[in-house]
Amino acid sequence: MSTNIAINGMGRIGRMVLRIALQNKNLNVVAINASYPPETIAHLINYDTTHGKYNLKVEPIENGLQVGDHKIKLVADRNPENLPWKELDIDIAIDATGKFNHGDKAIAHIKAGAKKVLLTGPSKGGHVQMVVKGVNDNQLDIEAFDIFSNASCTTNCIGPVAKVLNNQFGIVNGLMTTVHAITNDQKNIDNPHKDLRRARSCNESIIPTSTGAAKALKEVLPELEGKLHGMALRVPTKNVSLVDLVVDLEKEVTAEEVNQAFENAGLEGIIEVEHQPLVSVDFNTNPNSAIIDAKSTMVMSGNKVKVIAWYDNEWGYSNRVVDVAEQIGALLTSKETVSAS
């Protein structure tokens, strides 16, 4: 039995999640809430500058979209509490707007009739469980929580990497820098922004700024609380980012042993190890959370380690959103099956 999902928001992540979810047999995309007409949404799903032409044909219809024989209802209401989730029997509302990332706001989807909510960004508070695949997804709890957060693209990259290093060698402390492609909260030309560096043109400069990844990491890896800190450098590329992680370990290691730990981690689809001398464009539309750049792994004094991990901050992250939605759906189905028996 497939899980009925609705997607709130058709920005970069919302559209990528839709592309992926439409090809997942365990998910049934029932509805989209967006402020644009069907023709605009269909065009932006079919044709994407970064990820290319979609391999399915999405067509606009009256008040909706059609993909083959499958129809998706299109609604437009800025207040999630007014959305027809109960009428449409929505199991999971995926909120990709970034505007309802506090549990007290996301609860509007539950009030509208959705069984669960999945946020495509870090939670800003409230009764929300943050879930990162390959880190704490085995603790996903649909009994205790109605609202879940898939954290950030950077947390999804650094989380599995830090967990492997900590489990195998023990992390004493460390610093991370994410070299991040531009995002739509930056300015194409100089304009006001609460972060004065992000107020500057994203196409002209390397822009130092903050990242919430280290803070979010403690929610999914509490054993590393207080041990990692970091910052971001926004660079003028349209997609694909990397994490530069430097840690002091409890054990002495070699670069080969570090790379082998990632190879043996058993996190297929989450961590990939790349031995070729590649550059960022080569990882565009890579579905993994983290791709270890094996040639860049360094060790100094036996226990100081540098690891470079690439990630497609759009496509890789959106794959994890779909993975978590699928996991929540499977747990809901299992619960309903038990209740019916």
From Swiss-Prot:
D-glyceraldehyde 3-phosphate binds at S152, C153, T154, T183, R198, T211, G212, R234. NAD(+) binds at R12, I13, R78, T120, N184, N313. GO terms for biological process: glucose metabolic process; glycolytic process. It catalyses: D-glyceraldehyde 3-phosphate + phosphate + NAD(+) = (2R)-3-phospho-glyceroyl phosphate + NADH + H(+). Its EC number is 1.2.1.12. It is an enzyme of class 1 (oxidoreductase). InterPro entries: GlycerAld/Erythrose_P_DH (IPR020831), GlycerAld_3-P_DH_AS (IPR020830), GlycerAld_3-P_DH_cat (IPR020829), GlycerAld_3-P_DH_NAD(P)-bd (IPR020828), Glyceraldehyde-3-P_DH_1 (IPR006424), NAD(P)-bd_dom_sf (IPR036291). The record marks H180 as: Activates thiol group during catalysis. It comes from the Bacteria. It is found in: Cytoplasm. The keyword NAD applies. Keywords: Cytoplasm, Glycolysis, NAD, Nucleotide-binding, Oxidoreductase. Pathway: Carbohydrate degradation; glycolysis; pyruvate from D-glyceraldehyde 3-phosphate: step 1/5. The active site is at C153. GO terms for molecular function: glyceraldehyde-3-phosphate dehydrogenase (NAD+) (phosphorylating) activity; NAD binding; NADP binding. GO terms for cellular component: cytoplasm. Belongs to the glyceraldehyde-3-phosphate dehydrogenase family. Homotetramer. NCBIfam families: GAPDH-I (TIGR01534). Catalyzes the oxidative phosphorylation of glyceraldehyde 3-phosphate (G3P) to 1,3-bisphosphoglycerate (BPG) using the cofactor NAD. The first reaction step involves the formation of a hemiacetal intermediate between G3P and a cysteine residue, and this hemiacetal intermediate is then oxidized to a thioester, with concomitant reduction of NAD to NADH. The reduced NADH is then exchanged with the second NAD, and the thioester is attacked by a nucleophilic inorganic phosphate to produce BPG. This is Glyceraldehyde-3-phosphate dehydrogenase 2. The lineage of its organism: Bacteria, Bacillati, Bacillota, Bacilli, Bacillales.
